[in-house]
């Protein structure tokens, strides 16, 4: 996008409000529609990641999805609940052990972590996720929130396998009730058998971090619970491995299904080749030594086709129906498997595949037989890959039963004979790739995924014992479907996964079937017909389905209707209809009858009959509006109980009157009669005028009979006689018969005579028609009587008018005419005529049947071709006139250039054409004429051509191109001479034909066909019998491939450029790109650049008018047409997407936009930038104003065009891709001309001005030199300023784009230093007080102790009295001297006293809040101000109440994102310079704490020696060379004590930084020493740059000491630096919140010397000019706020999302929040407050602003951390954003708004939506009963009842009684309730006891 010119005044607001677009991680959109046009809930992850594994929690229904670099936890509707990142990371597969254990010398690269195994350990409530990084270590994650419980990686047992293929590992958990579980793991080893066992059993310890996690169940020097592949195996099969497809446990055994290579000899061959064999492996669960290992080959066969390559498997039960067929129990285990054809292609399996069933019991029986035979000593162990040599079985006397687990002999064991499964379903084109199965109502169902992304639903126990595929659905695009499929918790949904997409599909789609027949004929056992609801559904979803005939589950149970009568005439009304019903349930509620959309009427139910009436007369016209003699309507029955139509049958209304012929009338299937004398059709025969005029049968109709062809020559008068039957005799007053001929559109009527009922004759007449180009004209003939009564003509008799002379200009053509025409050749005039039209001399007229019927004077008009090879074989075509009438006339009388040419029967056309084949010419023959004789060779029967025929010699010289793809389709041009000679060309490349296309004298063009192999082939050309030889070679090479296309999107109108990379692309001559959408193919052109690159224009989609323009489209097929290469027609590996076309708005209603010259043209619209993931895309727009293009700048909603230098009216045209649009015209007005008076005035003023200028010039001259110098100086400053601005903007942009990976990887998994409950609550309740009295025992002199304790116990009783406590609080609050601090203190003290009685405390709090609400509303304050500030005891108590009750939520859920945000801010701030004096930083969210000038700095990496252990490894620490020494010490301490809480670390002030320079040289570095620079009363703190410490230096932190080095400066430096600076950085005694806003180092003001570090304090004005210059446009540095905000965005979003989610990371909403929000809603209802904004504000003031803002601004209340001033400032900006998000008011922002408001302006609307949704979700939750809440509060009280000293707290509260005793006693005396309980007396007792001195 073109850069916009700088506008300093709006730069910040523009960048902050527009620049930060939020990117969406996940999208939810409909999956591609299936054949049945259904959409499904779909989840897609990050574009760069692929999905690997899927597992569903059977207890919760949550889905865990293993992907590349991520684990997702999804809800059942595929919404993301939690995401856990697992990669990428730096690794190398050759690093063993991995680099996280020891240093690796191999080069490290960023490596993805492929999820290889995903298992739920239900017993310990955790997820086991194993990846490919670090040799295959596993994480154990908590199911609720994916919190990492453990990640063992320090032992070799922890490395499962380094292979990164996701389908290569399988695990099975075996659970025990009282022991640790076992994990059986089977994995491919990727050629590293010495590192990884291929199969093993491991311990699953209860403790996820236990040392024994994943240890082998048994392991000693000789035996272990594992099997490794021997290294010898790899010498036989170098790429040997065992690939594990599926695993499960059943009974006492664990099973795995595998694919493994082996070497076999094909039949009849001695050489061995590698094939893949599918095998089942079995192990005993309790076998620690793996002596029970047995493997057996499996496969299946159908119709002679072997299916041997296992693709997927699933264990299920048999079910009753399939069990009966197989002869097994319904609960027996069946193994459903998918195999592909053959054994050779593992990676590219053939598409032919089969679904097969194995009965597990039969496999076990086969294994038992093998064990028994081996223990009898028969055969060998037969396990070639494990035992390279054949080891014979050993005999042993023992009984082997079904549960035999082997001995240390005869083990492990292989079975040689294959166990064959039962094939139940095969698929030849779309390979099956996954399977899952279950039993539904005794039926066994399998769901199979395919290569193309379809789901096949198969009823395995289909009719007649065959499997029935009853539905196919397109689910994922692109495919294939991956192996892992899973049912939802209720088995009603199926989760299906491809590499890029997870889709939820219902196991049944009953709702798609619209009728009972469709429903029950579908074969889906889930579906039945809910009769009275007229819907296909599951039985349990149908109301009252158990009642008779209300639910049909078999076809014979469908409702059927018959109606009597089933048709009536449209002229009949209110006819009684009787409907016979079958399978109809009881209809006591009544039934209505309807005829489709006509009115309803009540039906009368009589037994199994229903009586209805046909529609009334007024409704019939609505029926007969359509054409035709009948209209079918649905007669429907509608249940009054359900209001649904439940049965219908077809009913016909017929209309006889539409028939206008007898035959159509009486042949109608309805009761129609023909009245032949009235010529009408009627349903009522009584309306016919004569009894004999009624016709009911077709044979009684008047009609013409079939006659032979009626031939009538033109201009010849003759009658036409016709045969007929049943011709009526016209009655009195009726007219007679006529014939009507329709000749070339005009009607000719001829009188006709009826001889009798069977004959009629058209009278003598002549006929004619126009034109000589028609020799035979068929004419329609109609016979009518009485003017318009037609006689039926069922035989469609026609009259044929003909002209002999038409198109028969020669004798031969004349005599070829149909003999029935009686035409002949009249020789005199040379015409074709009838005999009577030829002059009388008979000899002049020739006819075909005559004895002398030979035409003379043959003539040759054309010969083709005129050249041919001497060798002959050329087929010469000779055209002319009179070339004989029979083939025998010319059979032996043709010569071409003197060479015999043999005529061919196939090519002969009598009289017109001869085709003959040339013989071989002699060398002496070169050219000649064509000569023929017709019958006899007399002059009058001979002809010679005017053209010459030439004999040619053909040669070849070259061919281009000389290479092409194996698939063919290359257009090859072969050059040479005379190549157009002859008639037939055959081109061969070796044995492959090249299909002839065209030729000329100099070239032949042909298209190559496909070849099976890559090789060079000789080119041969044969023309007729001439074979042309030349050493030309054509080379077949590998087909082109497509590796990558970019971009993978276009707009719907297409024509966007697409770059394509591949191989051999230069072979293609006519490349095209294609997309198939909506069944239509769309194509566009490509251009090849070189062998590996080409460019294409995306094809446009043709979308219908009803298409929604804002929808994203995915083509069904996308690929390339590359000559004849079929494999790239559909490119499966691309995810090509079409985005909506840009849409522009017109220039207002008038379509004209008026502008001034130079004003930009703005075109508004939408979709101007495609919403592509990543967002960094653009379209090439061209905007023409008139004919001139303009410079374009684009945003998503507008297009800005810099108008060209034009005036007047011009059309604006925008073009992009394949579309163009004109929003209208633009009128650019010229500047208006000036009037004459104005011109005169200007001239006079100009003259005076010139005089004045002349006078001034003299004075100006003197100043010119000085001005020049000043101008140069200013120009130099401007240049410097411009350079700084450009550099800063460039840096800010680069920072904005920086990936936050480093930040997230540093934070992931670090321990969170939560404060304990007591410290946390103290920091909130009593901020700033470290050692509060409530934390220690009450200190009372011994002589007073007993009385004081007694008094406090009595006082405690009063505090626990609600009446007293409320009166006490109200009284205190009414005192003017009772300050805000006092109110907060009393609230906190009361809550500490009532910590053990939270039920009571809650009751008091609710009463106080209710009083506060009443008071607020009575004082007529705005309701929104309630709880806004802490002005009452109740408000502070509310804060404390949430503090107590949300601690668990903080620890388990919200604490993690809050701590991550704090760490992220701290790390981001420390990446750049931080001023130790002012606290300003390069990276900041706060404008107030931003360094506003350029600071030059470098990042150093120092190696630090630990202060605790000098021998420990050096720790690398990143430091900035501009850091002060104290800052360096802080960073080193952070690095060394990374996971140590702040309070347990050494203080920087207690340590010295020692620089070790080698050879024992050591130097103590300090912030101030004798080397510190002082300049003009400014003293600058020392930095690493000051000491010139280089990168890579070794430093150490040592305890504070006075050395000889700094002894000289000790008296001044140590005092200054230690007391003034270092102690300001870290000290104890008050919480961090009280000093978080102080600068890190305080200037030494007493000495008059001003301290500075990076920036001199803004308040001092004595800066150098250069310094001022560097700050001249300091606002430009505000762009760094954007960079910082962008980096921290993820952490802010995570925190806000966690707080505003009702269920996040597995934690439910705390009860306290729901309880308090419900209380506020009750109060609002009570006071009639229904304004949702007020309720929203109350809740926001109650929880987010009262509790969460406090936690965000003060994370040190929750964690043991140190918060510096810059971090505090940033947290304040986040807290302000949090507050704005909870507000209901709109914030109007502009360029003058505070930067922290602008910074998050774009995010706040979405945050507000989160808050509103949060409050709404809480409101929808079921209310919490007081009983449940009290139980919860009692539990909280019990857990923390001893945290505070109650006596000390009571003593603190009592101090307020002492201060306000009279005021407190007064209300107690006057209040009736208090008086009854003698509360005043009891308080006086307390006062007395507490005040006694002795």
Curated annotation (Swiss-Prot):
GO biological process, one term: vagus nerve morphogenesis
UniProt superkingdom: Eukaryota
PTM annotation (N6-acetyllysine): residues: 1350
Cytoplasmic side stretches: 1259-1894
Molecular function as annotated in GO: semaphorin receptor activity
Keyword annotations of the record: Acetylation, Cell membrane, Disulfide bond, Glycoprotein, Membrane, Receptor, Repeat, Signal, Transmembrane, Transmembrane helix
Annotated Gene Ontology cellular component terms: cerebellar climbing fiber to Purkinje cell synapse; plasma membrane; semaphorin receptor complex
InterPro entries per UniProt: Ig-like_fold, Ig_E-set, IPT_dom, Plexin, Plexin_cytoplasmic_RasGAP_dom, Plexin_RBD, Plexin_repeat, PSI
UniProt cross-references to Pfam families, sorted A to Z: Plexin_cytopl, Plexin_RBD, PSI, PSI_PlexinA-B, Sema, TIG, TIG_2, TIG_plexin
TM ranges: 1238-1258
Residues in compartment: Extracellular: 24-1237
UniProt-listed PROSITE patterns: SEMA
Membrane topology recorded in Swiss-Prot or TrEMBL: Single-pass type I membrane protein
Compartments (UniProt record): Cell membrane
Domain called PSI: residue spans: 509-559, 655-702, 803-856
Domain Sema: 24-507
Quaternary structure and interacting proteins, as annotated: Interacts with NRP1 and NRP2.
Function noted in UniProt: Coreceptor for SEMA3A. Necessary for signaling by class 3 semaphorins and subsequent remodeling of the cytoskeleton. Plays a role in axon guidance in the developing nervous system. Class 3 semaphorins bind to a complex composed of a neuropilin and a plexin. The plexin modulates the affinity of the complex for specific semaphorins, and its cytoplasmic domain is required for the activation of down-stream signaling events in the cytoplasm.
Protein name: Plexin-A4
């Amino acid at each position: 996008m073109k850069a916009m010119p700088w506008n300093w005044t709006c730069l910040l607001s523009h960048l902050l409000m527009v620049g930060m677009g939020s990117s969406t991680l996940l999208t939810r959109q409909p999956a591609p529609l299936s054949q049945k046009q259904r959409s499904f809930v779909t989840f897609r992850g990050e574009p760069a990641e692929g999905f690997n594994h899927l597992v569903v929690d059977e207890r919760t229904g949550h889905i865990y999805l293993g992907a590349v670099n991520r684990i997702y936890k999804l809800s059942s509707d595929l919404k993301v609940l939690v995401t856990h990142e697992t990669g990428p990371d730096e690794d190398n597969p050759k690093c063993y052990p991995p680099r996280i254990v020891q240093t690796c010398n191999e080069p490290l690269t960023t490596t993805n972590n492929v999820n290889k195994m995903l298992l739920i350990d239900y017993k310990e409530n955790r997820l086991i996720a194993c990846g490919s990084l670090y040799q295959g270590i596993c994480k154990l994650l908590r199911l609720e929130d994916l919190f990492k419980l453990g990640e063992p990686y320090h032992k070799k047992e922890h490395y499962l396998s380094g292979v990164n293929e996701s389908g290569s590992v399988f695990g099975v958990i075996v659970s025990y009730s009282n022991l640790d579980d076992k994990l059986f793991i089977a994995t491919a080893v990727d050629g590293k058998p010495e590192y990884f066992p291929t199969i093993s059993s491991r311990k699953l310890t209860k403790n996820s971090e236990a040392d024994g996690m994943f240890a082998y169940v048994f392991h000693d020097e000789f035996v272990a619970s594992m099997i490794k592949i021997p290294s010898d195996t790899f010498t036989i099969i170098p790429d040997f491995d065992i690939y594990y497809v599926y695993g499960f446990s059943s009974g006492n055994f664990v099973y795995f299904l595998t694919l493994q290579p082996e070497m076999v000899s094909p039949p009849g061959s001695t050489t061995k080749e590698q094939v893949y064999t599918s095998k089942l492996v079995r192990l005993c669960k309790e076998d620690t030594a793996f002596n029970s290992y047995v493997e057996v080959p499996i496969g299946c066969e159908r119709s002679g086709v072997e299916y041997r390559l296992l693709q997927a498997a699933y264990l299920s039960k048999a079910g009753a129906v399939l069990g009966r067929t197989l002869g097994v129990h319904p609960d027996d285990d069946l193994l459903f498997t998918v195999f592909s054809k053959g054994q050779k292609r593992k990676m590219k399996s053939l598409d032919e595949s089969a679904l097969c069933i194995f009965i597990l019991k039969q496999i076990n029986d086969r294994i038992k037989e093998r064990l028994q035979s081996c223990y009898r000593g028969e055969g060998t162990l037969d396990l070639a890959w494990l035992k390279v040599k054949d080891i014979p079985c050993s005999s042993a006397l023992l009984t082997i039963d079904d549960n035999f687990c082997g001995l240390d002999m005869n083990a492990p064991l292989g079975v040689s004979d294959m166990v064959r499964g039962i094939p139940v379903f095969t698929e030849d084109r779309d390979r099956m790739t996954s399977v899952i199965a279950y039993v539904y109502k005794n039926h066994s169902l399998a769901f199979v995924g395919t290569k193309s992304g379809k789901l096949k639903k198969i009823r395995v126990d289909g009719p007649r014992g065959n499997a029935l595929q009853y539905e196919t659905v397109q689910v994922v695009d692109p495919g294939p479907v991956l192996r892992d499929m899973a049912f939802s918790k209720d088995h009603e949904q199926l989760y299906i996964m491809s590499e890029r997409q997870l889709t939820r599909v219902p196991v049944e789609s009953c709702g798609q079937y619209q009728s009972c027949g469709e429903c029950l004929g579908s074969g889906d056992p889930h579906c039945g017909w809910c009769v009275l609801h007229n819907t296909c559904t599951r039985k349990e979803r149908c109301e009252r389905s158990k009642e008779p005939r209300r639910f049909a589950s078999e076809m014979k149970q469908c409702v059927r209707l018959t109606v009597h009568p089933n048709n009536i005439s449209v002229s009949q009304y209110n006819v009684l209809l009787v409907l016979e019903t079958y399978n109809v349930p009881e209809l006591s509620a009544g039934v209505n009858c309807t005829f489709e959309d006509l009115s309803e009427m009540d039906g009368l139910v009589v037994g199994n009959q229903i009586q209805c009436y046909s529609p009334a007369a007024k409704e019939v016209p609505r029926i007969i509006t359509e054409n035709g003699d009948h209209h079918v309507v649905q007669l429907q029955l509608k249940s009054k109980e359900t209001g649904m139509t439940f049965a219908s049958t077809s009913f016909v209304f017929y209309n006889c009157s539409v028939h206008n012929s007898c035959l159509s009338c009486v042949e109608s299937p309805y009761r129609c009669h023909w009245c032949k004398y009235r010529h009408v059709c009627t349903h009522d025969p009584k309306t016919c005028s004569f009894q004999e005029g009624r016709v009911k049968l077709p044979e009684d109709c008047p009609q013409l009979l079939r006659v032979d062809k009626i031939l009538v020559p033109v201009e010849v008068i003759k009658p036409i006689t016709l045969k007929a039957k049943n011709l009526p005799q016209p009655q009195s007053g009726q007219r007679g018969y006529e014939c009507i001929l329709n000749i070339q559109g005009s009607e000719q009527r001829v009188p006709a005579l009826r001889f009798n009922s069977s004959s009629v004759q058209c009278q003598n007449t002549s006929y004619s028609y126009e034109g000589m180009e028609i020799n035979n004209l068929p004419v329609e003939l109609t016979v009518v009587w009485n003017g318009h009564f037609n006689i039926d003509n069922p035989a469609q008799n026609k009259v044929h008018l003909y002209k002999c002379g038409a198109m028969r200009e020669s004798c031969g053509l004349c005599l070829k005419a149909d003999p029935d025409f009686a035409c002949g050749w009249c020789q005199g005039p040379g015409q074709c005529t009838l005999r009577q039209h030829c002059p009388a001399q008979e000899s002049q007229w020739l006819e075909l049947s005559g004895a002398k019927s030979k035409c003379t004077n043959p003539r040759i008009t054309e010969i083709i071709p005129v050249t041919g090879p001497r060798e002959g074989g050329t087929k010469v075509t000779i055209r002319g006139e009179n070339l004989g009438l029979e083939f025998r006339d010319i059979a032996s009388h043709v010569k071409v250039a003197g060479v015999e040419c043999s005529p061919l029967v196939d090519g002969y056309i009598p009289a017109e054409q001869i085709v003959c084949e040339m013989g071989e010419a002699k060398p002496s023959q070169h050219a000649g004429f064509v000569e023929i004789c017709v019958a006899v060779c007399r002059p009058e029967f001979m002809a010679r051509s005017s053209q010459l025929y030439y004999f040619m010699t053909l040669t070849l010289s070259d061919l281009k191109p000389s290479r092409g793809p194996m698939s063919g389709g290359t257009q090859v041009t072969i050059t040479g001479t005379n190549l157009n000679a002859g008639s037939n060309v055959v081109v061969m490349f070796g044995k492959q034909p090249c299909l002839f296309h065209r030729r000329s004298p100099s070239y032949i063009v042909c298209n190559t066909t496909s070849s099976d192999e890559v090789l060079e082939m000789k080119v041969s050309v044969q023309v007729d019998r001439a074979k042309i030889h030349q050493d030309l070679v054509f080379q077949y090479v590998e087909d082109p491939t497509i590796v990558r296309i970019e971009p993978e999107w276009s707009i719907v109108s297409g024509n966007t450029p697409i770059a394509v990379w591949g191989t051999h692309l230069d072979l293609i001559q006519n490349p095209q790109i294609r997309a198939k959408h909506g069944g239509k193919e769309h194509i566009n052109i490509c251009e090849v650049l070189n062998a590996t690159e080409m460019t294409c224009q995306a094809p446009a989609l043709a979308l219908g008018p009803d298409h929604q323009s804002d929808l994203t489209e995915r083509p069904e097929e996308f690929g390339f047409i590359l000559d004849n290469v079929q494999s790239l027609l559909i490119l499966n590996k691309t995810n090509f997407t079409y985005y909506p076309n840009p849409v522009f708005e017109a220039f207002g209603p008038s379509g004209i936009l008026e502008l001034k010259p130079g004003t930009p043209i703005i075109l508004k619209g939408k979709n101007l930038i495609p919403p592509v993931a990543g967002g960094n895309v653009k379209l090439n727009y061209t905007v023409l104003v008139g004919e001139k293009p303009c410079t374009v700048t684009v945003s998503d909603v507008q297009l800005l065009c810099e108008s060209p230098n034009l005036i007047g009216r011009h059309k604006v045209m925008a073009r992009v891709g394949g579309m163009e649009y004109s929003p209208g015209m633009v009128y650019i007005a010229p500047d208006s001309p000036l009037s004459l008076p104005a011109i005169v005035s200007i001239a006079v003023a100009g003259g005076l001005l010139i005089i004045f200028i002349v006078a001034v010039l003299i004075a100006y001259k003197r100043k010119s030199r000085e001005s020049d110098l000043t101008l140069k100086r200013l120009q130099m400053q401007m240049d410097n300023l411009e350079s700084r601005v450009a550099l800063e903007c460039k840096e800010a942009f680069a920072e904005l784009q920086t990936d936050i990976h480093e930040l997230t990887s540093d934070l992931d998994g670090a321990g969170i230093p939560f404060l304990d409950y007591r410290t946390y609550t103290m920091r909130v309740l009593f901020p700033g007080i470290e050692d509060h009295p409530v934390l220690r025992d009450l200190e009372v002199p011994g002589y007073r102790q007993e009385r004081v304790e007694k008094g406090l116990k009595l006082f405690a009783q009063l505090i626990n009295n609600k009446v007293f406590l409320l009166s006490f609080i109200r009284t205190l609050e009414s005192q003017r001297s009772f300050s805000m601090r006092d109110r907060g203190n009393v609230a906190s003290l009361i809550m500490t006293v009532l910590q053990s009685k939270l039920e009571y405390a809650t009751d008091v709090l609710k009463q106080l809040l209710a009083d506060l609400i009443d008071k607020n509303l009575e004082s007529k304050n705005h309701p929104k101000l309630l709880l806004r500030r802490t002005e009452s005891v109740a408000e502070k108590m509310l804060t404390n109440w949430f503090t107590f009750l949300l601690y668990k939520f903080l620890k388990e859920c919200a604490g993690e994102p809050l701590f991550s945000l704090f760490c992220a801010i701290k790390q981001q701030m420390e990446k750049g310079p931080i001023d130790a004096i002012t606290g300003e930083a390069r990276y900041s969210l706060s404008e107030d704490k931003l360094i506003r000038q350029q600071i030059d700095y470098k990042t150093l990496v120092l190696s630090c020696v630990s202060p605790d252990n000098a021998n420990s490894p050096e720790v690398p620490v990143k430091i900035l060379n501009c850091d002060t020494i104290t800052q360096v010490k802080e960073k080193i301490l952070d690095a060394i004590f990374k996971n140590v809480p702040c309070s347990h670390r050494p203080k920087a002030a207690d340590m010295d930084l020692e620089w070790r320079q080698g050879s024992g040289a050591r130097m103590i570095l300090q912030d101030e020493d004798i080397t510190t620079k002082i300049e003009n009363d400014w003293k600058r703190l020392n930095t690493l740059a000051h000491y010139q410490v280089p990168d890579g230096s070794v430093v150490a932190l040592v305890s504070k000491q006075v050395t000889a080095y700094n002894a000289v400066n000790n008296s001044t430096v140590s005092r200054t630096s230690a007391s003034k600076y270092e102690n300001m950085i870290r000290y104890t005694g008050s919480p961090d919140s009280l000093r978080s806003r102080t600068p890190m180092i305080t200037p030494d003001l007493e000495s008059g010397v001003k301290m500075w570090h990076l920036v001199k304090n803004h308040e001092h004005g004595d800066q150098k000019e250069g310094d001022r210059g560097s700050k001249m446009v300091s606002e430009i540095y505000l762009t760094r706020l954007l960079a910082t905000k962008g980096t921290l965005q993820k952490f802010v979003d995570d925190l806000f999302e966690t707080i505003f989610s009702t269920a996040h990371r597995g934690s439910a909403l705390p009860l306290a929040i729901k309880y308090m929000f419900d209380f506020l809603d009750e109060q609002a209802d009570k006071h009639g407050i229904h304004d949702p904004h007020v309720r929203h504000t109350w809740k926001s003031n109650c929880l987010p602003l009262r509790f969460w803002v406090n936690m965000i601004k003060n994370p040190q209340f929750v964690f043991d951390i140190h918060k510096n001033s810059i971090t505090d400032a940033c947290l304040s900006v986040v807290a302000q954003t949090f507050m704005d998000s909870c507000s209901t008011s709109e914030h109007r922002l502009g360029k003058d708004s505070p930067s922290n408001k602008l910074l998050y302006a774009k995010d706040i609307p979405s945050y507000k939506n989160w808050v509103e949704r949060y409050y709404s979700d809480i409101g929808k939750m079921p209310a919490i009963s007081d009983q449940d809440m009290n139980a919860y509060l009692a539990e909280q009280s019990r857990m923390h009842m001893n945290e505070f000293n109650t006596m000390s707290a009571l003593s603190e509260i009592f101090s307020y009684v002492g201060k306000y005793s009279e005021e407190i006693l007064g209300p107690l005396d006057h209040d009736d309730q208090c008086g009854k309980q003698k509360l005043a007396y009891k308080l006086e007792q307390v006062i007395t006891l507490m005040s006694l001195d002795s």
